Amino acid sequence: MKNKMYSMLVFTLISFLFYSYLIIWTPVLSVCSEKISFVNLTNFSMWPKFAKFHYESFEKTYIQSCDIPISKNCFKQILFWSFRLSQKKNICLSKINMLYLDNFPRWTLHFEFPTKTNRKRHVYLDNISFLYLVFATLAFKTMDDSCVNKIPFEVLASHLFKINFSQNKIETIFQDLQNHTEAQLFSRENSEQLFSFTNFIYYFVYNRTDCKNSISKFFYNSVNTRNVSTPFGVTNFSLVRGIMSPIQSFKGNLMFLENKTKVTKPTAIPNAVTSEPTKFFPSTRGTSSMQASQQTSSFPTTFFTTNHSNTST
């Protein structure tokens, strides 16, 4: 009888501690606890040493610069799974030091998106674009005021794209992006638009930097131009050669690593502000002020390409 009472007491104590742990730590772990089965990042263990080194260096910088400190494991999951755009905790990354990525080497991430048919949709994404995608989605998806208020959307819209928006209209645009469901987000149109949106963030961060020399080298060779859609309208972006890994150099500026590839054009965001397609001609005038951001004739294009494969799921 005594042993039985002792066992019940121990069981009760363990149960109490366990549920206390859940109550205390569930809000903290919720950001990093979700596993997304429909997005597969391949060959992470096969990355070359230089890629792993820069990944770890960026991880360290990311953790130290983040407004809300996170663990390394949390960073990795946020990095790998941020495509879902469903972080449950407002994490503001507006103060992250993007200058560290000036000379970040190029390597490719490979994502597989299952479709309703027996085919997989493959996306090969440049790592730089992906890191900025993380920055963009975590900053804008949450719509946290402390993040959003640091970015002068009105100035960016009027100065870069010659479009005048009210604050309410801007909030509506990003609310539309926030309200995309997973099915909508990973549709052909929206996933492509998401990369175009990333490109806008890329340019925004690029224009906020004062490290002109190193960045000018990063964007040194610019060839061709193409129209891409952004929440602020359609504009021309030039294609940057960048620093590519050996496997990418075989394909030039394309991110495809397979045969019979097909480049698809971005489409406009549903319910976004409509405007006439606007050609963007960067100014050569340089200044550090946000009202007149530093301009350059070398401008990064959308770092994405997509194709369909007959590989069965």
Swiss-Prot record:
InterPro entries assigned: Roseolovirus_U47 (IPR008645)
Glycoprotein as UniProt keyword: yes
Pfam families linked: Herpes_U47
Cellular component, GO annotation: virion component
Record keyword Protein biosynthesis present: no
Biased composition (Low complexity): 287-313
Region (Disordered): 274-313
Main location per the UniProt record: virion
Keywords carried by this UniProt record: Glycoprotein, Late protein, Virion
Induction summary: Expressed late in the viral replication cycle.
Top-level taxon: Viruses
Residues carrying covalently attached carbohydrate according to the record: N40, N43, N127, N164, N179, N207, N227, N236, N259, N307, N310
Post-translational modification, as annotated: A long 51 kDa and a short 49 kDa protein are produced possibly by proteolytic cleavage. N-glycosylated with high-mannose and complex glycans.
Location(s) in or outside the cell: Virion
Similarity remark: Belongs to the herpesviridae U47 family.
Protein name listed in UniProt: Glycoprotein U47 homolog
Phylogenetic lineage: Viruses, Duplodnaviria, Heunggongvirae, Peploviricota, Herviviricetes
Gene (name only): U47
